[in-house]
């Protein structure tokens, strides 16, 4: 069943504010297998192990950890896990940034990418390479405000857009934050890198729990 998808199609990468300087210094987000060791992790350790083994069946291939991951929605189940203290990271959601771009911007830049119809570690996840195949995703599930049940709804909400090896900072269009305090800190960090692209910084509490 084909479904209408938003065009442009926003994509969202979440990261801790402590990682922002490193991203700006390098001028890009790096895939886990390309990353320097001093990144502040907000992920489940056991899921990271699975991502390092989960093979990507579409070109350019490799494993999930060879890609920079994005969701198709803010306020993801992963952010809820952070908010509720379910991950090894215990710093809460306030320091978490949403870095926003679009699938079309990635395509226009000629970057290798794939995307999935649900959480990428699942054995029954389907992988796609063509933007028109975004219509294969369950956009009602992706945009759902309540996703705890049934389990398949949660799986589909966590569909992923995966960019091979690195994602240029120049393609980030917005940095969404939880609070004015974090927004001001982001602006201070951006000022330290005057040659880098300056995305808009927006307080979006409705993207958080």
UniProtKB/Swiss-Prot annotation:
Full protein name: DNA ADP-ribosyl transferase
Family, per entry: Belongs to the DarT ADP-ribosyltransferase family.
Region span, NAD(+)-binding element: 35-53
Record-listed E.C. numbers: 2.4.2.-
InterPro entries: DarT
Record-annotated membrane-spanning stretches: none
Region (ADP-ribosylating turn-turn loop): 116-160
Catalytic machinery residues: 51, 160
Entry's Gene Ontology molecular function annotations: DNA binding; glycosyltransferase activity; nucleotidyltransferase activity
Domain notes: The NAD(+)-binding element stabilizes the ADP-ribosylating turn-turn (ARTT) loop which confers substrate specificity; both domains contribute to ssDNA-binding.
Key words of the record: DNA-binding, Glycosyltransferase, Nucleotidyltransferase, Toxin-antitoxin system, Transferase
Summary of the function given for this chain in its UniProt record: Toxic component of the hybrid type II/IV toxin-antitoxin (TA) system DarTG, which plays a crucial role in controlling bacterial growth and bacteriophage infection. In case of phage infection, DarT toxin ADP-ribosylates DNA, which inhibits both viral DNA and RNA synthesis and leads to abortive infection. ADP-ribosylates ssDNA on the second thymidine of the consensus sequence 5'-TNTC-3'; the protein does not auto-modify. Arg-51 is highly flexible, allowing it to assume multiple positions in the crystal structures. Its toxic effect is neutralized by cognate antitoxin DarG.
Entry keyword annotation includes DNA-binding: yes
Pfam assignment, any one: DarT
Catalysed reaction, written as an equation: a thymidine in DNA + NAD(+) = an N-(ADP-alpha-D-ribosyl)-thymidine in DNA + nicotinamide + H(+)
Domain DarT: 9-209
Residues annotated to bind DNA: 44-50, 75-80, 145-148, 154-158
Site positions per UniProt: Specifically recognizes first thymidine of consensus sequence 5'-TGTC-3': 154
Binding site for NAD(+): 13-15, 22, 30, 51
Record text on subunit structure and interactions: Interacts with cognate antitoxin DarG (via C-terminus); this heterodimeric complex neutralizes the toxic effect of DarT by preventing ssDNA binding to DarT and consequently inactivating the toxin by direct protein-protein interactions.
